[in-house]
């Protein structure tokens, strides 16, 4: 007599689509970005917004090992006015993994993710600690600039001949202290979908997780390209 298999159906990031929950998307993208060095050493993170709810991974744990029931779920409290953008006091918890026996803190990136939602209408945000992003902040001062590179087309509203500009803000000792300068950059650069943080990494977003993923892959390619062109004596901000 044959036994019926009770194995759980397994999928990975290559099969993600709109039928998957935000928790499933975050878990799979974390695994993918860990292999690319974007969220190693417990750093970096991903957040998504869907149907009025905000999904955020916990802080200080290995991102490639995050499980679906470890994702915080928040929503905006309409009765609370935003006074301090660092505290996110206008958000209330819908689900906490600590209700299931965990002892986690929500990602320290929460105020930065929330700014991308509030100021830019993002649907998903990726925070990367990729080496290429960090190095790019060392070869540019206040703005990362590239032009005449084919991959620029992958950023919404940009083309091959355009100058793609990404603002660079100064790093701080604690993530939430970036809120003020990030808000200023979001308002000053309406055409960007990324903000670099000096000697740290980058925040990248899109209208949903699909566009955020596309933007993240394109920006990281351009960061790496600019660094390598610099090593070869070329200027990525020039068409020459």
From Swiss-Prot:
It catalyses: 5-(methylsulfanyl)-D-ribulose 1-phosphate = 5-methylsulfanyl-2,3-dioxopentyl phosphate + H2O. Its EC number is 4.2.1.109. Its main location: cytoplasm. Zn(2+) binds at residues 127, 129, 200. The active site is at residue 150. GO terms for cellular component: cytoplasm. Belongs to the aldolase class II family. MtnB subfamily. This is Probable methylthioribulose-1-phosphate dehydratase.
